[in-house]
A protein has these predicted regions:
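Metallo-beta-lactamase
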Residues: 2-9, 15, 36-42, 87-220
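Short, hydrophobic/aromatic-rich segments at coil-to-beta transitions
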Residues: 12-19, 115-120
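Pre-active-site segment of Zn-dependent metallo-hydrolases
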Residues: 19, 30-62
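Short beta->alpha connector loops
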Residues: 23-24, 43-47, 67-70, 125-128
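Short His-Asn-centered micro-motif
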Residues: 40-43, 64-68, 88-90, 123, ...
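Active-site environment of divalent metal-dependent phosphoester hydrolases
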Residues: 46-48, 69-73, 93-97, 150-152, ...
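Active-site HxH/HxHxD metal-binding segment of metal-dependent hydrolases
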Residues: 51-114
Length: 221
């Protein structure tokens, strides 16, 4: 049976990745090894419609706060899915615990449930505890990122090719710009992304995306 969702839309050409938007903010749902769903950066305000659409996709087992600023939807989604694991990086934990009053676990249990083609990335040089997902899928390399990159908004199902830097990111997200830039360029040299799904703005896809990201960081950081 083909999976359908009125709120979470399948990413074109990529199995197991679904995105939902409210305004300029995006939540990404990803299917784990046990067929349950990970929510990357739950977005406040999606409400009952999001919960109903997720029930079509599968049980939600993990709610990932991908940095310490992306926390406004966590309480709402934890009420929806009280059996889900709330997880974050150790760097993000202090502020998340203070702001949300929720109890978070580490990333180990989530990592153990990731498909073989997927890994968590924790960029060097940032101060927010940002966590990315890297997925290899049918020739595509997908990065799911939080505040590091953005793009002009697009319609559902469409892509854009020009990466941008979120205006607040250099001041509030970056601890050491050279360290972060070097880390990103090293990752690109190892396995360049062809798709970037940011939490803000449009989804990026192009053949030279890695080079575009590198050039952007060299110009702006």
């Amino acid at each position: 049976m083909k999976e359908k969702s009125p709120i979470f839309h399948a990413l074109t050409g990529v199995k197991g990745v679904y995105t939902a938007q409210t305004g300029k903010l995006r939540c990404t749902a990803y299917r784990l090894s046990d067929r349950s769903m990970l929510l990357y950066s739950p977005v406040a305000g999606l409400g009952d419609a999001a919960r109903e659409s997720l029930s079509i996709l599968g049980d939600v087992s993990n709610l990932l706060a991908p940095n310490h600023y992306h926390n406004k939807g966590l309480a709402e989604y934890f009420r929806f899915f009280p059996n889900a694991n709330l997880v974050c990086s150790t760097t993000a934990l202090p502020r998340l615990s203070k702001i949300t009053k929720l109890k978070f676990g580490g990333l180990g249990s989530l990592e153990n449930n990731l498909p073989d083609n997927t890994e968590l990335l924790e960029p060097d040089g940032l101060k927010t505890g940002e966590i990315w997902l890297q997925i290899k899928n049918k020739g595509e390399v997908i990065w799911i990122v939080t505040d590091a990159f953005t793009a002009q908004p697009t319609a559902v199902g469409e892509f854009t090719q020009e990466p941008l830097l979120l205006g607040t990111f250099p001041r509030y997200g970056v601890r050491d710009s050279e360290l972060f830039r070097t880390w990103v360029e090293t990752k690109i040299s190892e396995l360049a992304p062809t798709i970037v799904i940011p939490c803000h703005g449009g989804i990026l896809k192009c053949d030279n995306l890695g080079k575009s990201l590198s050039n952007l960081l060299r110009k702006t950081l």
